[in-house]
């Protein structure tokens, strides 16, 4: 096959003049003289299904074995391939860029702009597989060609997003931007942060059609640290929340993914926890399964974010202050916060001084506890214990070992051990009155440190969290039940309305049918009177008959249908004779027995209608119901 051969059932490969003419540098010994012929021949084979696999393997082999001098002619052959060729050819040309990036890496740095322009040229392709190959090629270039700054790849893609209006190109550029940011080793977050306002304008623009793909790119930028400042998050988070209610399910899914990345990647996420959690809670029951799962994952990520209020409620682990006695400064601060969290379950109390039982303060503390627990009849023993305690208190610097022990306990707590909750027992007036009589320490309060087992506190916090989760689940269940109740009530209203409409329709139909029957009787009577067959004062059509039929005022023109007038036929002799005989019998009977019963009148009317039935077998006009 020649160089300018044609694809089977497809236009030929077109090359620009610059690519068809061989430069002196391309004729170096390291470049085969038939490189272009081999590449174009393989591209021609790609259009044939039988030779597709063989041509793809050969092109990959050529791309892997290229030298520095052969990069330029090879890229020219790929770049100048006509866009009217078959889809496998276009896809393979882009895939070759991925092969080049993976095998040659930074050697392609001088040709990176050419490769990016080749990718952008293929982004208009209507075939989604070609655009996906462009995204893969962009990711490989961003990951393996690292000597050039990341802006050399991202900037052309962002400019393409802003300037172009083709929907396929917008989708492809957004996918390539997201792939390049995810694959880059140094995505230059500062440059991405500067480009976010432009992307935000595109998201708000009605003319931009690839909003779902662009939201995916925004999520990648957030992961790379491009939204790490409060001004950016102040406008970005409301935009993402707005897209949660979009009509496009892909946009809803991408917005939920971006919100989840804000929760995991940004340090300022705690300031937006309430807003984002509320928005995701209201949209978590989406009709599309994949969107619903994405929103639930994002909601769980936001629930794990700790707010500033929750951080302030954590146990204080600061060092001691100069204005307090030894280790008990932390006792006073932490007890006011955490003592309310203790449950009524039994606890294992282990005093801090239990580690050094020979300390004198331990005797003082034990004596004080025994003094409080003794009954009143042992006042003498209590006095001795208090004297011993007061004498021990005056012995000197006995708080030093206690402080050391407490500091060791605090170091253990700060190093990851269980939290120690300390409690202060203040009995100023009682201790002053009892200790002053013996000349003891007039401190005004007795501070007794006690350590609590960390399991009880942990269990208490777990119970609080479980109760919060249970309350949230109960509120959701109540909302669901209320929604179901509203739906059932609306369905019941619709059913009642339908039943009422059906009943009124049936009644209307019955009235119309009865009206038609009365109209038919009236017409038959009028016809008989007009022909002179029945006297006007006969009981069959008289106004004083007990079985008088309603007049024609009940009729409406909508009951009738105009038909073509037919010629009036004469009645046969037999029909006229039968009619005359019936009329005479009816007239004689009505004149002789006018005061008969209602039953007799109804029978006469039936006889009259039977007589008229024979006459009206061929009516002059058609009556339609």
UniProtKB/Swiss-Prot annotation:
- Which segments carry the HEAT repeats? 69-106, 110-147, 149-186, 190-227, 230-268
Q: Looking at the record, which segments are called Disordered?
A: 1-34, 391-466, 582-625
- Asked whether the UniProt record includes Magnesium among its keywords, one would answer no
Instruction: Locate the Phosphoserine modifications and list their residues.
Output: 475
Q: Does the keyword Nuclease apply?
A: no
**Origin, by domain of life?**
Eukaryota
Q: What is one cellular component GO term in this UniProt entry?
A: microtubule
Composition bias (Low complexity) maps to: 12-29
The GO terms this record gives for MF are: microtubule binding
Composition skew (Polar residues), residue ranges: 612-625
Q: Which SUPFAM superfamilies match?
A: ARM repeat
Q: What keyword terms does UniProt attach to this protein?
A: Phosphoprotein, Repeat
Annotated Pfam families? TOR1L1_N (PF24714)
Q: What is this protein called?
A: TORTIFOLIA1-like protein 4
* Bias type Basic and acidic residues, positions: 404-413, 420-434, 455-466
Q: What are the leading ranks of the lineage?
A: Eukaryota, Viridiplantae, Streptophyta, Embryophyta, Tracheophyta
């Amino acid at each position: 096959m020649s160089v300018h051969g044609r694809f089977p059932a497809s236009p030929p490969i077109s090359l620009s003049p610059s690519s068809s003419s061989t430069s002196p540098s391309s004729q170096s010994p390291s470049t085969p003289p038939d490189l272009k012929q081999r590449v174009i021949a393989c591209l021609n084979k790609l259009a044939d299904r039988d030779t597709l696999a063989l041509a793809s393997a050969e092109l990959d082999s050529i791309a892997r074995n290229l030298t520095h001098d052969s990069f330029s002619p090879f890229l020219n052959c790929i770049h100048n391939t006509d866009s009217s060729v078959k889809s496998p050819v276009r896809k393979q040309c882009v895939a070759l860029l991925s092969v080049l990036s993976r095998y040659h890496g930074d050697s392609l740095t001088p040709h990176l702009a050419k490769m990016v322009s080749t990718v952008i040229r293929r982004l208009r392709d209507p075939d989604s597989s070609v655009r996906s190959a462009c995204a893969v090629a962009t990711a490989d270039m961003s990951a393996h060609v690292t000597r050039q700054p990341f802006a050399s790849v991202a900037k052309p893609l962002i400019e393409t997003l802003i300037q172009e209006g083709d929907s396929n190109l917008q989708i492809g550029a957004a996918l390539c931007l997201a792939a390049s940011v995810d694959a880059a080793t140094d995505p230059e977050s500062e440059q991405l942060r500067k480009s976010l306002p432009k992307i935000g304008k595109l998201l708000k623009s009605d003319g931009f059609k690839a909003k779902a793909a662009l939201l995916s790119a925004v999520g990648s930028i957030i992961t790379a640290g491009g939204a790490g400042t409060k001004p950016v998050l102040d406008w970005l988070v409301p935009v993402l929340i707005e897209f949660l209610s979009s009509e496009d399910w892909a946009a809803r899914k991408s917005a939920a993914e971006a919100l989840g990345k804000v929760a995991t990647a940004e340090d300022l996420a705690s300031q937006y926890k309430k807003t984002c959690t509320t928005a995701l809670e209201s949209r978590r029951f989406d009709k599309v399964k994949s969107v619903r799962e994405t929103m639930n994952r994002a909601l769980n990520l936001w629930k794990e974010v700790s707010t500033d209020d929750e951080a302030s409620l954590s146990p204080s682990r600061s060092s001691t202050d100069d204005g307090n006695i030894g280790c008990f400064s932390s006792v006073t601060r932490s007890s006011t916060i955490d003592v309310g969290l203790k449950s009524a379950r039994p606890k294992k109390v282990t005093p801090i001084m239990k580690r050094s039982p020979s300390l004198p303060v331990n005797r003082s503390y034990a004596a004080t506890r025994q003094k409080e627990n003794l009954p009143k009849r042992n006042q003498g023993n209590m006095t001795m214990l208090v004297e011993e305690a007061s004498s021990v208190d005056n012995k000197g610097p006995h708080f030093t070992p206690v402080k050391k022990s407490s500091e060791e306990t605090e170091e253990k707590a700060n190093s990851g051990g269980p939290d120690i909750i300390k409690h202060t027992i203040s009995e100023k007036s009682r201790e002053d009155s009892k200790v002053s009589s013996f000349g003891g320490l007039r401190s005004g309060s007795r501070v007794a440190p006690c350590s609590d087992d960390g399991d009880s506190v942990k269990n208490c916090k777990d119970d609080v969290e479980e109760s919060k989760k249970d309350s949230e689940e109960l509120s959701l269940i109540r909302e669901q039940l209320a929604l179901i109740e509203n739906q059932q009530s609306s369905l019941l209203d619709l059913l009642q309305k339908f039943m009422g409409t059906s009943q009124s329709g049936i009644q209307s139909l019955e009235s119309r049918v009865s009206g038609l029957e009365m109209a038919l009787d009236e017409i038959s009577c009028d016809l008989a009177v007009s022909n002179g067959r029945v006297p006007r004062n006969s009981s069959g059509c008289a106004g004083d008959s007990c079985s008088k039929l309603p007049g024609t005022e009940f009729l409406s023109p909508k009951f009738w249908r105009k038909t073509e007038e037919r010629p009036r036929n004469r009645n046969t002799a037999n029909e006229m004779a039968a009619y005359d005989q019936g009329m005479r019998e009816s007239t004689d009977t009505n004149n002789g027995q006018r005061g008969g019963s209602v039953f007799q009148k109804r029978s006469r009317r039936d006889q009259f209608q039977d007589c008229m039935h024979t006459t009206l077998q061929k009516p002059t006009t058609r009556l339609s119901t």
